[in-house]
Amino acid sequence: MALVVLVTFICLGLPCGEALAQKSKAAEDTLEAFDRNNFDNSANVDNKWFPLQPGTQVVYKGFTEEEGKRVPARVVQTVTDLTKVINGVRTVVVWDVDYKEGKVKESEIIFFAQDKDGNVWLLGELREVYDEAEFVGNRAWLAGMDGSHAGIMMKADPRPGTPSYSQGYAPPPFNWADRGAVEKVGQKACVPAGCYKDVLVIAEGSKHEGPDAQQLKYYAPGVGYIKVGWRGKGEKLRETLDLVEVVKLTPDALAKARAEALEIEKRAYLYGRTPPAELMKSSNAKGQ
């Protein structure tokens, strides 16, 4: 059953029809100008608001709303010691697992890079979907392939009142066209992991969800996002998340996370057209 569904996604994910090649001119007009020459030590992401230190794992807990029901949610994000070259830029690989009611709902690897100016870019995602903890298929988008474009996840100097920015674009079946805008700075927020000052609030939305649906993300300096909220009558998921734990993984735990990320890569269909992920040269992780 899983193999059949995976083959279906392969057809959707690759240019086997005109639908994938199509993207609106509106999307093209609002994309960020991407210059691969403006990246140097790009897998070293040390942006104040979006630091990605290999071996760091963050855990969030909260709720989503599905069919009028409040569903417990848990998200575990791990910065691996893997890198991957996408569209000529070396990215760091982040492994993200979403749990609903204690069961894996989605598992994905996400690719980030920092440019010379300090902006953090999103260059793609490979997402696996599970039904009752059983793998049923995957979807992927990678910048520079099949009409997909990189976007900015965090500005080097985020300021209120500045224009919104594209967080990337991926045509169907992924349908990624999110935008971010700086909402507030200098805020205070308390979550189970602690209380934080100088918090930055980013409002995110998508044309696919409509103008009356936004996700609010709260970023603490030196930590990353610590809280997720929502606003708007059109918001369907109504996800709320709070940071509950920040962990520095042991070499063995990091090796296990690396292995899980590589397994996702092995199951992917787009990866036959890109170089494989590699272990960071500076990594001293064990378990090779």
Protein language model features and the residues they cover:
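Detector for methionine-enriched segments
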Residues: 1, 145, 153-154, 280
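Bacterial N-terminal signal peptides
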Residues: 2-15
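Sec/Tat signal peptide C-region and signal peptidase I cleavage site
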Residues: 16-20
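Acidic, serine/threonine-rich low-complexity disordered tracts
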Residues: 23-116, 122-129, 158-288
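Acidic/charged, solvent-exposed loop-and-adjacent secondary-structure segments enriched in E/D, K/R, S/T
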Residues: 134-151
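Short aromatic loop motif centered on NTY/YTY
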Residues: 149-154, 178
